[in-house]
Design a protein with these regions (language model features):
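Short hydrophobic alpha-helical segments enriched in small aliphatic residues
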Residues: 4, 10-12, 21
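N-terminal compositionally biased or targeting/leader segments
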Residues: 14-16
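Surface-exposed, interaction-prone regions used to assemble/regulate multi-protein complexes
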Residues: 18-154
Length: 154
């Protein structure tokens, strides 16, 4: 781990530390553009040497209707808390809303790198590694959602 820490983004460390020194509640940052994605990856060191420490899923989108069930993705939320040891043991909280598809592997809590991008339908895709295909992506943890927000909590 010491080697990975020496490679981390020093500017990201300073920015994060400054925000905690100033105190107060840190608001969630929305991902709305590729610049927002770049900012997220820079400030969180691409979650390098991260460990998923908590997963919360809230589904208020299933309703019973005559003959079955109705699902509303707009009423779903997934919150991941990831301890990132490459940036002074910070906890990054990522909140996804309006989930279309997601999978968090219970035997893959380690994160070496992440990919975040907008797909052809302008949905946010978050993956726990850098995959080259949808089939490879489904071997790990991933989220496809309409929105993504993040903050550093600890």
């Amino acid at each position: 781990m010491g080697f990975a820490r020496s490679l981390c983004n020093t500017n990201a460390k300073l920015t994060i530390k400054q925000r905690f020194v100033e105190g107060g509640i840190i608001m969630l940052h929305s991902i709305k553009s590729t610049n927002d994605i770049k900012d997220f990856l820079d400030k969180t060191n691409s979650l390098h040497d991260g460990y998923i420490v908590e997963v919360k899923y809230n589904n208020n989108g299933i309703s019973k209707i005559k003959g079955g069930h109705y699902f509303e993705p707009a009423k779903t939320k997934l919150v991941l808390q990831i301890l990132v040891t490459s940036i002074w043991d910070a906890v990054v909280e990522i909140e996804f809303e309006n989930l279309l598809e997601w999978q968090i592997k219970d035997n893959h809590s380690d994160i070496f790198d992440v990919s975040v991008f907008f797909n052809e339908n302008n949905l946010i895709v978050w993956m726990d590694d850098i995959y080259t295909s949808a089939e490879d992506m489904k071997k790990g943890s991933y989220v496809i959602a309409e929105s993504m927000k993040w903050r550093i909590t600890k």
